[in-house]
């Protein structure tokens, strides 16, 4: 299994210029990929940011030469028209051949209600149906042909994308449960999940579901890039490693809260009520490199080959330096 390392560019935490510089630093520190969150609103009102993901990708693309760039993740189904998303990614695919991927998910109310979604926030069944339809439409458009598409949610009439990269754009499907993970196995070029939810989720549900989906579609599961965002707060100062997780307290809210709360002020209020011990449970918090690697290893053993590291602290350059010095050599040794 070939191990790849990625950097999570946290658009909820850093402004546009700083976030671009961090992407450039990620390549300089040996990362193979950099993925960016796509939020219209951040998890936090105070101190939060939300630069536009696609502007970030093009800016970093111009200043790097080998880094794979993508979203983790974008929802191409509500505030975006999937045909326009397909056009945007096709353009980036032409500008940075072989380096662009589109990571997609079913969406959160936080980003869609503020931009005018009307009515009740849809249940998972509809959000998932929209996602499948959007992916199907985008892939048709990436063939470069004229597309007449009549779906339940989206429609095109004689639509063409005139500049498309050879082979289209790889689509990575984000999943937190087996239903979407099976879809990733059937249809995804890649699969995305996040760490810190109990190893049985990955070993007994997600990875078997990806394999099941691939088998039903007569695909080789080994050809699917299996990406996981590793939530890690590593610092040689143990107190700093723990305290750095505090900004990301919203990640420790329940799935229902994260998918239904549509106001960053309310999200921040709910998150700040959590004790630091509960916040830190979502993270690998370590000051010893061997301890950190020991906690990362089970994800590799589960078959996840593309590790994207999300560090919570404000000094991201420090994390990249420590990762390159302390963690990367040990992790590559596991391969």
UniProtKB/Swiss-Prot annotation:
Active site (record annotation): 39, 108
Transmembrane helix is among the record's keywords: no
CDD domains per UniProt: Tetrahydromethanopterin_reductase
Molecular function GO labels: coenzyme F420 binding; glucose-6-phosphate dehydrogenase (coenzyme F420) activity; oxidoreductase activity, acting on paired donors, with incorporation or reduction of molecular oxygen
Keyword annotations: Carbohydrate metabolism, Oxidoreductase, Plasmid
The protein's enzyme class: oxidoreductase
Coiled coil: none
Annotated InterPro entries: F420-dep_G6P_DH (IPR019944), F420-G6PD/mer (IPR050564), F420_G6P_DH-rel (IPR019945), Luciferase-like_dom (IPR011251), Luciferase-like_sf (IPR036661)
GO biological process: carbohydrate metabolic process
Enzyme Commission no: 1.1.98.2
Binding of coenzyme F420-(gamma-Glu)n, residues: 38, 75, 106-107, 111, 176-177, 179-180
Annotated catalysed reactions: oxidized coenzyme F420-(gamma-L-Glu)(n) + D-glucose 6-phosphate + H(+) = 6-phospho-D-glucono-1,5-lactone + reduced coenzyme F420-(gamma-L-Glu)(n)
Pfam family, one: Bac_luciferase
Record: residues binding substrate: 194, 197, 258, 282
Function: Catalyzes the coenzyme F420-dependent oxidation of glucose 6-phosphate (G6P) to 6-phosphogluconolactone.
Quaternary structure and interacting proteins, as annotated: Homodimer.
Family named by the database record: Belongs to the F420-dependent glucose-6-phosphate dehydrogenase family.
Protein's name in the database: F420-dependent glucose-6-phosphate dehydrogenase 1
Naturally occurring in which organism (per UniProt): Rhodococcus jostii (strain RHA1)
Gene assigned in the entry: fgd1
């Amino acid at each position: 299994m070939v191990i790849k390392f990625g950097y999570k560019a946290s658009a909820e935490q850093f402004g546009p210029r700083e976030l671009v510089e961090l992407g450039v630093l990620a390549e300089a520190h040996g990362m193979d990929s950099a993925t960016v969150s796509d939020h219209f609103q951040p998890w936090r009102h105070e101190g939060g940011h939300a630069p536009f993901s696609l502007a970030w990708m093009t800016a970093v693309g111009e200043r790097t030469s080998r880094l794979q760039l993508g979203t983790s993740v974008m929802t191409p189904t509500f505030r975006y028209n999937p045909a326009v998303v397909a056009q945007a990614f096709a353009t980036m695919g032409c500008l940075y051949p072989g380096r662009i991927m589109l990571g997609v998910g079913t969406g959160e109310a936080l980003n869609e209600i503020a931009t005018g979604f009307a009515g009740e926030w849809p249940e998972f069944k509809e959000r998932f149906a929209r996602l499948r339809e959007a992916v199907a439409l985008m892939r048709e458009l990436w063939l470069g042909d004229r597309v007449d598409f009549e779906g339940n949610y989206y429609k095109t009439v004689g639509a063409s994308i005139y500049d498309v990269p050879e082979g289209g754009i790889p689509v990575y499907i984000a999943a937190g449960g087996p239903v979407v993970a099976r879809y990733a196995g059937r249809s995804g070029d890649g699969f995305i999940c996040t760490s810190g939810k109990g190893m049985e989720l990955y070993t007994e549900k997600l990875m078997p579901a990806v394999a099941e989906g691939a088998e039903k579609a007569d695909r080789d599961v080994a050809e699917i890039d299996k990406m996981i965002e590793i939530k890690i707060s590593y610092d040689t100062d143990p107190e700093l490693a723990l305290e750095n997780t505090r900004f990301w307290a919203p990640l420790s809210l329940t799935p229902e809260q994260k998918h239904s709360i549509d106001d960053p002020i309310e999200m921040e209020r709910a998150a700040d009520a959590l004790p630091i011990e509960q916040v830190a449970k979502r993270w690998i918090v370590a000051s010893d490199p061997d301890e950190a690697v020991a906690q990362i290893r089970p994800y590799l053993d589960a078959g996840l080959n593309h590790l994207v590291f999300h560090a919570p602290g404000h000094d991201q350059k420090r994390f990249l330096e420590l990762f390159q010095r302390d963690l990367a050599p040990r992790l590559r040794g596991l391969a």
